[in-house]
Structures are given as C-alpha cells and as structure tokens.
C-alpha cells in the first residue's frame, strides 16, 4: 500500500503546513503513500514536480521515477528513503536535507538487506549524511548518480558518498561524488564492481576493507587525500584507473594479496598539508605498498609525483614489470634486508632517469637500474644528511660502493630496464 503525503509546493496552508509535515517526518518513516504518484503501468510510478517532506519506506516492488522538479526533503532527520523489498528502482529523484547522524546510518537512500536487486539510478543527492547505504543486500546497482556532501561539515563528520556493507554482487558505475568523506567505501563486500566513477575533493576516492574478488575499473580520482585506499583485501583487479593531483597517495596497498594492478595512471601526487594518520610518512607517493605480497603490478604509469613507489614492511614476492616511472622527484624508496628484482621474463620497467645504454638495440638497457644505494638509505634515516649531498664525504661513500660492491646493501634492482615507455597494459 502507498499512503499519501501532500506536496508542499501545492499546499495552500503555506509555511505552517510545511513545518507540521516536517515535524511529523522526524517522528517516523511512513510508507510512500500520499505522494501524488501517477501509475504508468507495469509497476512503474511517477512523482510530479514539487517539494515533498518526510521520511519514507518503500516496502513493495516498484519503479519510482521522479519528474523534473520533484524534490524529496527529509527534514534533517533519519534516512529519506528506506528500501525493504526486492525489485525496487529509484530513478531521477532530487533528495535533500536527510539526517546527518552517522551512528544511526542516516542516508539519502538506505537499501536494506531484503531489498535485493535494488537499482538506484540517475538521482541527485546533496547532504551531510551518507548518500547511498547498501546494507547486507545482494545484487544492488548504483548507477549514474550525482552525490555531493556538505562542505560546511568537517570531512570526518560527513558520510560516505556510497557505502557498501556486507554486500554481494554490487555494481557501482558512472557516479559523480564530491565533498563527502569517502567516495565509495566497500566493507566486507565480495564480488563487487566499481566502474567508471568520478571522485573529487574527498578523503579517499575508493576505499576497500576486508573485501575479496572485486574489480575497480576505469575510475577517476582528483584532489583527494588518497585516490585508491586498498586495505586488508585479496584478489582485487584494479585496472584502467586514473589518479590526478591527489594528496599523500595515488594508490595505497595495505595488506593486499593476490591482486592485479594493471593499466592505471597516477600523476601529480603531492605531499598533503597533513599526513595520513594511519601510516606515517605521506610524502606524496604515487604508489605505496605496505605489507602486501604476491601481487602483479604491470603496465602502470606513475608520473610527476614527489615519490614514485615506496615498498616497506615485508612487501615481497610481487611481480613489478612493464611500468613507467616518469619525472618523479624520487623514483623509489625501499628499505629492507632482501634484494628485490623488478623485472619479469626478461622485461623490466621504464625509468625516466635511467642513464644506461642499449648497444644491441633490443629495447633493453645493458646496465641494470639500481635506484637506491647506501647514501639514499642514510638520507631516509637521517634527513638532515641532505645538507651534505654535494660534499666530498658523500661522494667518497658513493665511490666506495662502486669500488667494493660487497658493502652494498640489498635494494631494488631492475636487470632489464626499458629504453622506451611501454604500451598500455592490456586488460585482464
């Protein structure tokens, strides 16, 4: 059944009725009844232009389409639309002024566990709470929505644009998200796909936690504090994404295993005004790999950033080849006690600062590329040593390393550096 609520736009009682309806909306969510819906047949309903106040539950299969000028107002409390039945589509609606209580999971559209197969398409959401929350449901699709947070609220007090919790087989595609906390947060949600979204002015663009067998494809992050934060997950496929002018990290891998990063482009990562509290040392890293093993990292481009790639905390047994490191202020940071070979099947990476030669013209450098030496390690441990970079003592240390390789510490070695930038990595 659909119980009715009256359009504020068409009411003659004016502001008094508006306040009354807004007050009632704070008390409880009602079935979407007296919204003046027009039956279009085959389970499809249209909502005419106007401003409608309340918190509503959709508890049966239907396709709700809002006509141009239709706006739902949540009165500043609770979730605006709550979906509790399979087979619901919400399309083309403008949603405003829902609650901002993150503990209560206030969202513009809350998709409950029973609402399997929900489709949230082409809506315009603007508010401080969560945009779309998918809660332990199956087969939901969030497509082509525009979601904007409230810049007047501190970033950490805003909701995420799209939040997946314990969800399976979700598709998030074609959305534009800005000024929320994270663009899309995926928690304990397997077999999801995040495709062709645009995330700007956020904490993290894409944030994975405890999620497996999922895809992140063809997304763009811009001016976030971390473009792609991939954490405590395995078997992720991350391809064709771009990170432009993000702070701290372009792609962060934290406890990631058996995953693929291919064909991604990261450029212009800079040091943030504040570091990331989770892992110290956010120096503008295009790629940061922390305690991550058995991953394939091939065919990516990391360019024009403060630091190209940083490996630490036991990040070993990763296949790193066919990538391009271009114009980074520092290409590699690696401090560990084990040698790392960054080439595979006789093919290494392209390094814009490689000074070797290719006498047989096979496209591979004849001299290995070794970006780190004992002097680099000394500078990482004691940054004040930078003041002595051009001093005779530093030059003597470098000469000793070359003359007596036995004193060279383990580090990164690319035995087959590429002389030319590689072609884009084909998609898996």
From Swiss-Prot:
Main location: periplasm
Keywords carried by this UniProt record: Periplasm, Repeat, Signal
GO cellular component annotations of the record: periplasmic space
Compartment(s) of residence: Periplasm
Subunit note: The complex may be composed of an ATP-binding protein (NosF), a transmembrane protein (NosY) and a solute-binding protein (NosD).
NCBIfam families registered for this protein in UniProt: NosD_copper_fam, para_beta_helix
Name the UniProt record assigns to this protein: Probable ABC transporter binding protein NosD
Source organism: Pseudomonas aeruginosa (strain ATCC 15692 / DSM 22644 / CIP 104116 / JCM 14847 / LMG 12228 / 1C / PRS 101 / PAO1)
Protein encoded by which gene: nosD
């Amino acid at each position: 059944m659909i119980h009715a609520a009256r359009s504020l736009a068409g009411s003659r009682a004016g502001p008094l009725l508006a306040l009354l309806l807004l007050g009632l909306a704070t008390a409880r969510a009602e079935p979407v009844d007296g919204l003046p819906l027009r039956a279009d047949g085959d389970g499809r309903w249209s909502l005419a232009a106007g401003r409608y106040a309340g918190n509503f539950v959709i508890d049966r299969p239907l396709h709700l389409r809002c006509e141009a000028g239709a706006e739902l107002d949540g009165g500043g409390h609770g979730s605006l639309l709550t979906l509790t039945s399979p087979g619901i589509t919400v399309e083309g609606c403008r949603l405003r002024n829902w609650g901002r209580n993150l503990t209560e999971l206030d969202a513009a559209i809350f998709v409950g566990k029973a609402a399997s197969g929900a489709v949230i398409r082409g809506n315009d959401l603007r508010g401080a709470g969560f945009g779309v929350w998918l809660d332990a449901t199956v087969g939901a699709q969030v497509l082509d929505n525009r979601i904007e947070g409230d810049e007047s609220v501190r970033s950490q007090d805003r909701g995420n644009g799209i939040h997946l919790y314990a969800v399976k087989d979700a598709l998030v595609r074609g959305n534009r998200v800005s000024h929320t906390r994270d663009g899309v947060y995926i928690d304990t949600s397997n077999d999801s796909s995040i495709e062709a979204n645009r995330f700007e002015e956020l904490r993290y663009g894409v944030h994975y936690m405890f999620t497996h067998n999922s895809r992140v494809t063809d997304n763009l992050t811009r001016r976030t504090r971390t473009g792609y934060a991939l954490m405590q997950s395995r078997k992720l496929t991350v391809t064709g994404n771009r990170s432009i002018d993000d702070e701290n990290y372009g792609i962060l891998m934290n406890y990631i295993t058996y995953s693929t990063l291919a064909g991604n482009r990261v450029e212009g990562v800079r040091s943030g005004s504040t570091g990331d509290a989770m892992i110290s040392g956010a120096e503008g890293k295009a790629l940061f790999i922390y305690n991550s093993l058995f991953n394939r990292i091939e065919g990516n481009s990391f360019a024009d950033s403060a630091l190209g790639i940083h490996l630490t905390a036991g990040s070993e047994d990763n296949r790193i080849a066919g990538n391009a490191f271009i114009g980074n202020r520092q290409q590699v940071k690696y401090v560990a006690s084990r040698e790392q070979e960054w080439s595979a099947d006789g093919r290494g990476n392209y390094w814009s600062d490689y000074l070797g030669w290719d006498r047989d013209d096979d496209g591979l450098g004849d001299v290995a590329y070794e970006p780190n030496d004992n002097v680099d390690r000394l500078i990482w441990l004691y940054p004040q040593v930078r003041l002595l970079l051009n001093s005779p003592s530093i030059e003597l240390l470098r000469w000793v390393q070359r003359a007596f390789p036995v004193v060279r510490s383990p580090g990164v070695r690319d035995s087959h550096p590429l002389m030319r930038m590689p072609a884009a990595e084909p998609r898996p």
